């Protein structure tokens, strides 16, 4: 029944071709494969309005296709799925005669399919082109309600071919018997993915000579399982599918195409973007390949490792260099997981015949790919892994949640080798609360933590606003976290506190304002008022000095011996140990002041070091490219030289002998 319907359709198309196209086109000659494929497509388009895309072809349309017409909507969708320009499709519609007669009969439909195949093969869209032997047309369609696949057998072993019915179940083309399994294993699979050597076994490469001059869609890349025909292939008499002498016809081997339909991703996109869109299965495969090179997905792959991996794809060095330039968005000589996926996808596309884009497509941008990764693995893992590696007292905190309670907690920390009473603690808290501004919103991360974080590539900078910037704004510097107590000379700590303590009253001398009022204390600690007052001499001018002084002047200030401050009276010796408490409180700003110039210098040096490393990597890559190019040119030179010698020998033999 099917063969009769196909023959009737072909006969009707061939008989009506002369009148269907206007000015006497040549007779429409179809091979058996084209007859079966075209009649099947016509039946689907004719029955799409009634049966829907998931139903099989109606029997009425298949038995008598000459009496049916294809619905305009399904035909338009099918033609758009050829991915030809709208102008070309309009020209095909005019040439096939459908625009003149007002409908798509079998004749117009078949001629249009031949013209689509000619346009996809690079031939001009003319009626004369349908005389040539052409491959079957290729279509790529998308449906939101489900996945629909049109499939052809992987390879033709004879002159008869059967096209599977339309199905809406993913991977639902089933084998009918063991004979089909043998045929499928001996036929090349139709997955268009040509992955590097480290791909899993089911990612099989399809040679470009087998009909894949381009990727049809990004969806096809990651569906490795072959889509088998529902019905067994019909073999000509006297031949067997498993015989070693069986070879497909040469022209039919180039006719085979697999046109598939993949469900669109979450956001709709135009057809030109589809090849550059990474599917879920592709992303999973790329991530697995990345983890084989770098177990930590939040880390990166160095340029040398990526180079050794990608050169296995056998692409030329200039193409690989261009892919690297496209994918390495931040130009740091290393690939993160999104950049690796983009580079891998570009290499796979190039291996399958797609020309490389002029710029990185939007669907391969690192921001787009990073948003597609699961958040627990990508957004939080870098920070969590770093926090786990630090001791408990050095872990970074949330920089936007600094409260006064943290300052008070710092004040509550016991000072070694000291007997601090509760009243002393309250006094110290009040002093700190007066010194600090009300709207402190930054965490006092140490320069050590800041530098260690900056030294890690691609990680966020958790460092707070520098002391120099805070002083320029006239604000007080953030209090550093507690450090192991160090012995500071009294004069040194006093001198450093001139610069970094806020403007508060100091001593009671005639030259300086009186000290701040402190809560009452027991008698043994009354001298703390004097010691704390002496810790803050001449502080009213500190902010202006800090705003005007440059780092160079501060360095000079630190290198000079500290000058003795004006004292109101001499302290007894038994109060020397008690004075260590405010000295310890001042040691934090003193240490911060000593280390203040270092973050800027280290930041500059780290930037310079990173720039030098990037330049070294780029030079090494360029050197490798030039070395390979040099070897290729040397080989060509050697071949040309040998050719020249051979030609000279031939010329010498052909030259007539001159007799003197």
Swiss-Prot record:
Coiled-coil zones: 601-657
Main location (coarse class): cytoplasm
Originating organism: Homo sapiens (Human)
Positions of modified residues (Phosphoserine): 254, 493
Keyword terms, alphabetized: Calcium, Coiled coil, Cytoplasm, Metal-binding, Phosphoprotein, Repeat
Annotated Low complexity bias: 582-594
Protein name: RalBP1-associated Eps domain-containing protein 2
Listed Pro residues bias regions: 512-523
InterPro entries: EF-hand-dom_pair (IPR011992), EF_Hand_1_Ca_BS (IPR018247), EF_hand_dom (IPR002048), EH_dom (IPR000261)
Binding site for Ca(2+): 328, 330, 332, 339
